[in-house]
Amino acid sequence: MDRIRIVGGNALNGIIPISGAKNAALPLMIASLLTSDTLTLENVPHLADVELLLRILGNHGVDIAVNGRRERQSGSYSRTIHFTCRTIVDTNAPYELVSKMRASFWVIGPLLAREGKARVSLPGGCAIGTRPVDLFIDGLRALGATLEIDSGYIEATAPKGGLIGASYTFPKVSVGATHVMLMAASLARGTTVIHNAAREPEVVDLANCLNAMGAKITGQGTATITIEGVTSLSGARHRVLPDRIETGTYAMAVAMTGGDVTLEGTDITLLDTAVEALRRAGAEVSAIEDGIRVIGHGDAIRPVDIVTEPFPGFPTDLQAQFMGLMTRAQGVAHVTETIFENRFMHVQELARLGAKITLSGQTARIEGVQRLRGAPVMATDLRASVSLVIAGLAAEGETLVNRVYHLDRGFERLEEKLTRCGAIVERISD
């Protein structure tokens, strides 16, 4: 099992290219099931989750070509992938694949919309709470579908003639459930109105792609989205938006270690709340042509309290990284998690590096320390693992991050990008 070895103490200076967003790429890839034409996606990142979803889509009958050729990957960062699903050959999504990644459960929407039936295993993925599928089930039932849970699978059937448009209000904001409803309702009969919809940029990106395919969606980016169902969707070409979580992660790394880094190919408007928190912490963050410039001051980090919230609030996927930054703040900061339960598993590992963190319910109290010291640590999930890398960059001595397969799920060539900016980071294969 691979490990990441980090020797801390170096400021980051240079250019880091930002990859396409995993959280946008996955639903866009799944949308290829909605059409028999070719959907071409540009800026798709090289990630373990993407590779797994390619396998899942292949099982359903999607023909996949990378950069116009049948190859696994090129030598560059993000790539172009062509998806063609002339016929859906299997409406079953098996446990052995779906259990490895929660987002693969989202195929239930397109399968139900296009084929009228689906048998999908209950999902897996990061161990950060229960994340129930009730919102997905209730939303699809509102469109007329019949859904039953049997032996760990959801058996879904559309009414005769297909799904039926309806008005539905999510009791809780859910990005994944909004994705599924957008895809399913695009081919439903009549008009669907989603209330309390997720407003995340990745939801907007999916809606824009579906519209390019011939869907009729309005209101994306607001809490109310309207979808006028169409009889079929066509192919399209769409570019995956930049990864705002990767952007914020590297920005926090620069703020913590010091230095001057250009984050290339990203958009500052995708993470206004996180940028504001970084500025309050003392980092200089500014928009430049085709990117963001971040200047960090390392030892002059100010404490900042944050609360995670659905977009446009502070992203839960940057909570662990920001907590890592606050371990070096000059004072006491508080981080409150409102999206997921059990998302403080990185606290014990940060403590191994010398962090002073105490928990009270869903709030962490971080008392900044003058220095962190390297130590062996264990990655517990995707975002927690990268917070340990950030902390290791600022720690004295050597940090070994174990179980880095979590990193490979969401960060494209992380050690390569950091090394280019002066960090001492290497992957060790046992």
Swiss-Prot record:
The pathway is: Cell wall biogenesis; peptidoglycan biosynthesis
UniProt-annotated binding residues for phosphoenolpyruvate: K22, N23
Q: What PANTHER family does the record tag this protein with?
A: UDP-N-ACETYLGLUCOSAMINE 1-CARBOXYVINYLTRANSFERASE
Read off the lineage from the record. Bacteria, Pseudomonadati, Pseudomonadota, Alphaproteobacteria, Hyphomicrobiales
Q: Which InterPro entries match?
A: Enolpyruvate_Tfrase_dom (IPR001986), Enolpyruvate_Tfrase_sf (IPR036968), MurA_subfamily (IPR050068), RNA3'P_cycl/enolpyr_Trfase_a/b (IPR013792), UDP_GlcNAc_COvinyl_MurA (IPR005750)
Presence of keyword Cell cycle: yes
Functional description taken from the UniProt entry = Cell wall formation. Adds enolpyruvyl to UDP-N-acetylglucosamine.
The EC number on file is 2.5.1.7
Residues that the record marks as modified (2-(S-cysteinyl)pyruvic acid O-phosphothioketal) are C126
Tell me the protein's name. UDP-N-acetylglucosamine 1-carboxyvinyltransferase
Q: Which GO terms describe its cellular component?
A: cytoplasm
What protein family is recorded? Belongs to the EPSP synthase family. MurA subfamily.
Subcellular location field: Cytoplasm
What keywords are annotated for this sequence in UniProt? Cell cycle, Cell division, Cell shape, Cell wall biogenesis/degradation, Cytoplasm, Peptidoglycan synthesis, Pyruvate, Transferase
Its recorded reaction(s) are: phosphoenolpyruvate + UDP-N-acetyl-alpha-D-glucosamine = UDP-N-acetyl-3-O-(1-carboxyvinyl)-alpha-D-glucosamine + phosphate
Picking any one GO molecular function of the record gives: UDP-N-acetylglucosamine 1-carboxyvinyltransferase activity
**Entries under NCBIfam families matching the protein:** murA, PRK09369.1
